[in-house]
Amino acid sequence: KVFAIDILDMEKIDGVNFFQISIEKIEEIEEIDLLKGKFNLVISDIAPNLTGITAVDCANVLDLNHLTISTAHKFLEKGGALIMKTFQNNNLKSLRKNMELSFKLVQTYKPAASKKQSGEIYIYGVK
């Protein structure tokens, strides 16, 4: 099964169960909550609305990343993987160290499709 959650509406995709809800409330969805520890992959491209104030934006990104890691840790099976969007900033090193506490393999990568000047990167972790 494929589940998608987002605070914004999403176009229907065959085979995808979509829930318009914040990640903070994912455990309120019984169909998903019953599958704790059974997901083999969690993909997150969550990003906050950017303010242009670096300190605020970095803190907001970090908060969402920690929420994503916590959620993935609850729902992933052993050997399951997390792919999470984040941004290159002063918090990246500590974020990666935090992930290394819960995941046996952690790697960062920048997709070829991402613009060179963009700070967007992805962190991959295997539980």
Predicted regions and their residues:
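A short glycine-rich, Lys/Arg-flanked "PGG" loop and its adjoining helix->strand segment in the class I
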Residues: 60-78
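Short beta-strand element of Class I
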Residues: 1-3
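Class I S-adenosyl-L-methionine
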Residues: 86-127
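Short catalytic-loop micro-motif centered on adjacent basic/acidic residues
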Residues: 81-85
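S-adenosyl-L-methionine
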Residues: 5-51
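Glycine/threonine-rich flexible loop motifs
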Residues: 50-61
